[in-house]
Amino acid sequence: FDKQYYPPLCGENPVCNTCTFSKNMIISSPNKSGKTTILKSTVINLIFSQQFGYGFYKSAFVNPYTHIHSYINIPDTSGRDSLFQAESRRCKEILDIIHDTDCDTRHFCIFDELYSGTNPVEASNAGNAFIQYLQQYNNVNFILTTHYTSICKKYKNHKRVQNYKMDVII
């Protein structure tokens, strides 16, 4: 998507971003810098493009996906699961769907701060393992946001993953 933007900001002066799917994306930056907005913009534009043939961008080339998976705002199910358990369950659900479909299907996934409900060391390790597992599937594209620089460093020179960083002006 060339110069895509978040539709609810249509009447304002939205920041436009270009998003390509030649490699999977890992986006790092501080809170309130727009990471989640890029995820939402991309998935909204993907759905609009596939369903209606247009979206909120200057131009786009879209190779349709058969499955779109979202890991945003995982609820802490009070009294039942910890946040970490809820996050792990959601990751497993996504992996099960990917694993159980044939390789002709295409999957697009957005992950907003994997395992934010646990300590940084375990979260980083779990996030790295999750990304590593996804890499075995050529039919899966993803955008992942994170605060963990260890995840970014691990995939710094990876052939299927590109790191991005959002700067914040204070």
Indicate residue ranges for each PLM-predicted region.
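ATPase nucleotide-binding head domains, primarily ABC-like/P-loop NTPase cores
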Residues: 1-170
